[in-house]
Regions:
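N-terminal nucleophile
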Residues: 21-250
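Bacterial N-terminal signal peptides
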Residues: 5-15
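Sec-dependent signal peptide recognition
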Residues: 2-7, 65
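Sec/Tat signal peptide C-region and signal peptidase I cleavage site
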Residues: 16-20
């Protein structure tokens, strides 16, 4: 029991947040989907937002461990901390509680950056998941869970965004990348982020599932800036290009 407590304490001490005194960061208003394919063993996620380079801090994944998405009033350290706790054998539900309990609720230049606004989801390598939307996440904010998937978002047009994402993921056949992409498209069709579109990303992992030797990254795609057009259109082009030219590992 002491060993487990020590592992948890060590994991939660990783990547402690560094509070910038220069500016108040913008909330990562976004919608995202995490999903698992029991046939391939792949786990992955995809995200779209009206911020630059959303893929840089929202999605965190490790083969044979799981995936974490952290957004809204975001603490990026939830990503590596969540993976460390998964690696230590904790359940997604326990990890959600541990991350919130250990959050110091910091402020920026005297302004609150409340953990009540955090939104994050944790999925293990077998598709088990837990998700949290804090009461201070900017409306509309919430999540919807489904079979081997969870969709979450904030500053959205409404609840239909996450509902339609889950429905699209469950109804779509083919590789996990196509199912994640279908979910993003459905979320945008339902209204998406109320502020518009700018960037999108996708990350899928599996042990030795990538090209070349000792590569666990099946797919890592980022469209960092497309505010004048449609980041999902470009992300879909890349996903479809990969699917026509690669034979995804099984």
């Amino acid at each position: 029991m002491r060993l487990i407590a020590a592992i948890v304490a060590c994991a939660l001490s990783l990547a402690a947040p560094v509070v910038s005194q220069d500016r108040l960061p913008d909330p990562v208003a976004t919608f995202s989907i995490l999903g698992y394919d029991p046939q391939t063993g792949e786990v992955g996620g995809a995200v779209q937002s009206r911020v630059f380079a959303v893929g840089n801090g929202v999605l965190w994944a490790e083969a044979d461990v799981g995936i974490v998405t952290t957004q809204a009033i975001v603490d990026v350290s939830y990503g590596p901390k969540g993976l460390a706790l998964l690696r230590a054998g904790m359940t997604p539900q326990a990890i959600v509680r541990a991350l919130l309990d250990s959050d110091p609720d910091p402020g920026y230049r005297g302004q609150p950056w409340p953990k009540g606004g955090r939104q994050f989801a944790v999925m293990d390598a077998k598709g088990n998941y837990a998700v949290h939307t804090g009461p201070e996440a900017t409306a509309w904010a919430g999540h919807k869970t489904g079979k081997f998937c969870t969709a979450q978002g904030n500053i959205l047009a409404g609840e239909a965004v996450v509902n339609d994402m889950v429905a699209a993921f469950e109804a779509t056949d083919g590789h996990l990348s196509l199912r994640l992409m279908a979910a993003l498209d459905a979320g945008q069709k339902a209204g998406g982020d109320k502020r518009g579109m700018q960037s999108a990303a996708m990350l899928i992992v599996k042990k030795n599932g990538g090209v070349w030797l000792n590569n666990d990254t099946v797919l890592r795609l980022q469209v960092d800036e497309a505010s004048a057009s449609d980041p999902l259109k470009e992300l879909r082009r890349l996903v479809e290009y990969w699917n026509t030219r690669q034979r995804p590992p099984r």
